[in-house]
């Protein structure tokens, strides 16, 4: 939502969120992939055209949210492999083992993604006051 409205400036709330998550949950090894997984979502969103039609946005935003949830384990896996000494096969096994959770993550993100367009409209309206 912030990336669609604020573009590059959205990195500020992203990393404030990452910092708060670390403060709340502890700056342990699980936190390290947070430093880049959210930036990947930001980058994908930045690649979308600015003037995207609402009819397209209503489908694209939930799909991107769902894909990010589905691929979260894949995005997380390289850091886990490096931190825990997994070889490529071990990393793939870790991804496959987490896939049921990624499916749940994708489903939740897909549903939440339908809120993106209405919330973007509200935020843009508030910005132009």
Predicted feature residues:
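Interfacial aromatic-anchored transmembrane helix boundaries in multi-pass membrane proteins
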Residues: 16-51
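Transmembrane helix irregularities
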Residues: 4-6, 24, 107
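Membrane-embedded alpha-helical hairpins and interfacial helices in multi-pass inner-membrane proteins
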Residues: 28-33, 47, 54-129
